[in-house]
Amino acid sequence: MNPRPKLRSPPPSSVVISPGSPPKSLINKMPRKFTRSTLTLATTLFSILALYAFLNTFIFSDPPNNVSSVSFSRNYNTQNLKSVKVYMYDLPRKFTYGVIESYALARGGEKQSDDSLLKYPGNQHSAEWYLFSDLNRPSLERVGSAVTRVMNPEEADLFYVPFFSSLSLVANPIRSNNAVVAPVERPAYSDEETQESLIEWLEQQEYWKRNNGWDHVFICQDPNALYKVVDKVKNGVLLVSDFGRLARNQASLVKDVILPYSHRINTYTGDIGVENRNSLLFFMGNRYRKEGGKIRDLLFQLLEKEEDVIIKHGAQSRESRREARKGMHTSKFCLHPAGDTPSACRLFDAIVSLCVPVIISDHIELPFEDIVDYRKIAIFVDSNTAVKPGFLVKKLRKVSMERVLEYQRELKKVKHYYEYEDPNGTVKEIWRQVSLKLPLVRLMINRDKRLVKREFTEPDCSCLCSNQTGILTTL
């Protein structure tokens, strides 16, 4: 905050007007008629200012203190700014409900004659289903959203491609090395073929060709989703969990949107407090991961003998989720180390559990950072420091109970941003983030039409950072 400006005395030549009446010297030097007009004007201006002050104080005053200024500002902007028009492609069935059906059939399910009977399986990458469902809702149920669905593509600012890319990736069950597999020539479902088929379909669409895909939005929340064709859709706005598997010329914070995982732990419904949180630190997950996730094994070695720390190896299962829910709801801090990629569902499980996240992931990107200050809800520790013997638990034990409560208060304020089923939660915020990309999309469309493409020997970020392309002559 800037210091209050010092009061300055008027210069010697100034006329000081005392309250009550105009100075005599000024009256003597002016015609009486002019002086009366001046006083009338001054009275009118004073009345206008007084009315403005009244309205500003009592009618247009700031929201009450118990209303979050961030939420107020966000809701005000959402309701008052012109919404972005989005056209959702009516994709062939195999890219939407067909993926759900293939997933179910591969697990012993039966074909359904009615798509409404198909149920999208709950998983950490289910954002694709929530966004698809949201755009299919009646417009009256989407009041306040930053985007409006239009049925005429000519009216659209952006085009949403609702391919269930993350579910497609796992439509065929992953079998262990010891599993006995029936001798078949090929799987019934091929994610790679489905990806390529999507591109073939898109390349036939007028609106895809019109702007080279810049105004298209794709969801690929699983780090490996769309891996086969990502170079063909990289111009578009990508909705991703992180950039762990994407090259620098494929994705960036400038162009794309970071999504939260759909949490798998039930939301903590109690109030803030530490009375029932007897454990210092909790973690449950796969101990052995690749790449940046190798730090997990080191953390296991350091922490598994600490008496007030619960750290367990566990795979995905209902029983594991029940155990994780109990652990997160009864611990003060929840560990979030990197996995195969920088992000993981565990962070969002911790947030809705009001368990203060301890993030040890050097390259993590976080969703909604324009409205959420993660320093207020989480503790960050770099990997090299975290693996120093005794450092982590010593640091956490020094955190006062009042400080833990402060973290919990902030977590409670923002946790709705990570609830996909909340009408004012994740889905609404994702669309707001997408709408903010529109000015850049328009810039890139216009820029793209005047430039000559050049071939580079290695990936670059010229599309985002600088003009490393040639100029197209327009004369």
Where are these regions (language model features)?
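Juxtamembrane luminal stem/stalk of type II transmembrane Golgi/ER carbohydrate-processing enzymes
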Residues: N2-R287, E291-R318, A324, H329, ...
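Catalytic binding pocket for nucleotide-activated donors in carbohydrate/polymer assembly enzymes
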Residues: E323-Y418
